[in-house]
Amino acid sequence: MSSGAPQKSSPMASGAEETPGFLDTLLQDFPALLNPEDPLPWKAPGTVLSQEEVEGELAELAMGFLGSRKAPPPLAAALAHEAVSQLLQTDLSEFRKLPREEEEEEEDDDEEEKAPVTLLDAQSLAQSFFNRLWEVAGQWQKQVPLAARASQRQWLVSIHAIRNTRRKMEDRHVSLPSFNQLFGLSDPVNRAYFAVFDGHGGVDAARYAAVHVHTNAARQPELPTDPEGALREAFRRTDQMFLRKAKRERLQSGTTGVCALIAGATLHVAWLGDSQVILVQQGQVVKLMEPHRPERQDEKARIEALGGFVSHMDCWRVNGTLAVSRAIGDVFQKPYVSGEADAASRALTGSEDYLLLACDGFFDVVPHQEVVGLVQSHLTRQQGSGLRVAEELVAAARERGSHDNITVMVVFLRDPQELLEGGNQGEGDPQAEGRRQDLPSSLPEPETQAPPRS
């Protein structure tokens, strides 16, 4: 899972590493439980956590640590799940700090917001968690559970992210092929999750979303029967959780986001703001979504009905500030900047080439239809290797004048070598645009084409 600092494009670990060998090495390097004065092997998630944040933050802690040690993804996810589950079944009161009332900047009628908040010490909680992880690893040395050894589809995912000319990098991304193992889901539907979050006003909201959206999705009872609804609820709940954190810690950041959940033979996408995902099928772009922007007629009407306004400065902005109309966070712009995501689904037939998820730093300057040619030319030059294609796409965005943070993720649904051998069926075809599959008619068209955002 790649929700920490941005990383260069990389393939998914093959999982071919010997699981018992990994456990042996791990326990050789960490032969004893941690003492209170010992340093943590991986950075703790902040200073305090609310109880609703514990599962996601500890899972992220484990996946970051195990990923740094090249653990096979199914093993890393299963280990993380078992250790988190065991710790959550214990009494966490020993980690409790004195409860305090959330400080309200303005009067709020929501009783939940006014209730005392139980906060836990993140450092001591992380130490206890690592000791639990060592214990589970020791137990599994004798007998590794089937879930940790189960074969799964090997995904080729190319990821590249750059700060560009901005002072700070505020994007985050997630690549989680072992979704089921991380959350202990035992139904027969294989799931993989991918996401890009584009932060603004700081990285806190983007990092938070990269940790908690998929955790909240996995905990929705309707995930097996209504994945779209589960993803929408996951965004909504993550927004509520972050707003509580933002009020406690006086954070002002926000983030747009887009995610793709591949569940068996169905693709589910959800989005908030202007980060986007497209599908390429047999060389043709399939538009899956319409980004949320202030100039969209329905978004403008929603904002004005709430008492806000949309104005054009260097670009269209909500209340003269934000260039997005929906986002997680942005505590001082709620409810005008909505935390309600949209979602859509599509059956996969096996003829799909790849998914591309990216932030507006890419899509504001690279039209959808140019993506196919850029990917195909890269595959041609690299003799069918798609490993570094995201770097090529990021470079193309920079050449076209993007100054924003740029994150691009390409999830191949077929072997790139097959795409090279099959050629780019849409390139140079005057009827390609007519054959392009467009977004569902239930989604509104934008009022105007949005200019690049600075």
UniProtKB/Swiss-Prot annotation:
<feature type="modified residue" description="Phosphoserine">
    <location>
        <position position="454"/>
    </location>
</feature>
<keyword id="KW-0597">Phosphoprotein</keyword>
<keyword id="KW-0464">Manganese</keyword>
<dbReference type="GO" id="GO:0005829">
    <property type="term" value="C:cytosol"/>
</dbReference>
<feature type="binding site">
    <location>
        <position position="199"/>
    </location>
    <ligand>
        <name>Mn(2+) 1</name>
    </ligand>
</feature>
<dbReference type="GO" id="GO:0032880">
    <property type="term" value="P:regulation of protein localization"/>
</dbReference>
<feature type="region of interest" description="Disordered">
    <location>
        <begin position="1"/>
        <end position="28"/>
    </location>
</feature>
<comment type="similarity">
    <text>Belongs to the PP2C family.</text>
</comment>
<dbReference type="GO" id="GO:0007165">
    <property type="term" value="P:signal transduction"/>
</dbReference>
<keyword id="KW-0460">Magnesium</keyword>
<comment type="subunit">
    <text>Associates with FEM1B.</text>
</comment>
<keyword id="KW-0479">Metal-binding</keyword>
<dbReference type="GO" id="GO:0006915">
    <property type="term" value="P:apoptotic process"/>
</dbReference>
<dbReference type="GO" id="GO:0051894">
    <property type="term" value="P:positive regulation of focal adhesion assembly"/>
</dbReference>
<keyword id="KW-0378">Hydrolase</keyword>
<dbReference type="GO" id="GO:0004722">
    <property type="term" value="F:protein serine/threonine phosphatase activity"/>
</dbReference>
<feature type="region of interest" description="Disordered">
    <location>
        <begin position="419"/>
        <end position="454"/>
    </location>
</feature>
<feature type="binding site">
    <location>
        <position position="198"/>
    </location>
    <ligand>
        <name>Mn(2+) 1</name>
    </ligand>
</feature>
<dbReference type="GO" id="GO:0045892">
    <property type="term" value="P:negative regulation of DNA-templated transcription"/>
</dbReference>
<dbReference type="GO" id="GO:0051224">
    <property type="term" value="P:negative regulation of protein transport"/>
</dbReference>
<feature type="domain" description="PPM-type phosphatase">
    <location>
        <begin position="156"/>
        <end position="413"/>
    </location>
</feature>
<dbReference type="InterPro" id="IPR000222">
    <property type="entry name" value="PP2C_BS"/>
</dbReference>
<keyword id="KW-0904">Protein phosphatase</keyword>
<protein>
    <recommendedName>
        <fullName>Protein phosphatase 1F</fullName>
        <ecNumber>3.1.3.16</ecNumber>
    </recommendedName>
</protein>
<dbReference type="GO" id="GO:0048471">
    <property type="term" value="C:perinuclear region of cytoplasm"/>
</dbReference>
<feature type="binding site">
    <location>
        <position position="360"/>
    </location>
    <ligand>
        <name>Mn(2+) 2</name>
    </ligand>
</feature>
<dbReference type="GO" id="GO:0051496">
    <property type="term" value="P:positive regulation of stress fiber assembly"/>
</dbReference>
<dbReference type="GO" id="GO:0046872">
    <property type="term" value="F:metal ion binding"/>
</dbReference>
<dbReference type="GO" id="GO:0030335">
    <property type="term" value="P:positive regulation of cell migration"/>
</dbReference>
<comment type="function">
    <text>Dephosphorylates and concomitantly deactivates CaM-kinase II activated upon autophosphorylation, and CaM-kinases IV and I activated upon phosphorylation by CaM-kinase kinase. Promotes apoptosis.</text>
</comment>
<dbReference type="GO" id="GO:0050921">
    <property type="term" value="P:positive regulation of chemotaxis"/>
</dbReference>
<dbReference type="GO" id="GO:0005634">
    <property type="term" value="C:nucleus"/>
</dbReference>
<dbReference type="GO" id="GO:0035556">
    <property type="term" value="P:intracellular signal transduction"/>
</dbReference>
<dbReference type="GO" id="GO:0008138">
    <property type="term" value="F:protein tyrosine/serine/threonine phosphatase activity"/>
</dbReference>
<dbReference type="InterPro" id="IPR001932">
    <property type="entry name" value="PPM-type_phosphatase-like_dom"/>
</dbReference>
<dbReference type="GO" id="GO:2000048">
    <property type="term" value="P:negative regulation of cell-cell adhesion mediated by cadherin"/>
</dbReference>
<feature type="binding site">
    <location>
        <position position="198"/>
    </location>
    <ligand>
        <name>Mn(2+) 2</name>
    </ligand>
</feature>
<dbReference type="GO" id="GO:0032991">
    <property type="term" value="C:protein-containing complex"/>
</dbReference>
<dbReference type="Pfam" id="PF00481">
    <property type="entry name" value="PP2C"/>
</dbReference>
<dbReference type="GO" id="GO:0010634">
    <property type="term" value="P:positive regulation of epithelial cell migration"/>
</dbReference>
<dbReference type="GO" id="GO:0033192">
    <property type="term" value="F:calmodulin-dependent protein phosphatase activity"/>
</dbReference>
<dbReference type="GO" id="GO:0071466">
    <property type="term" value="P:cellular response to xenobiotic stimulus"/>
</dbReference>
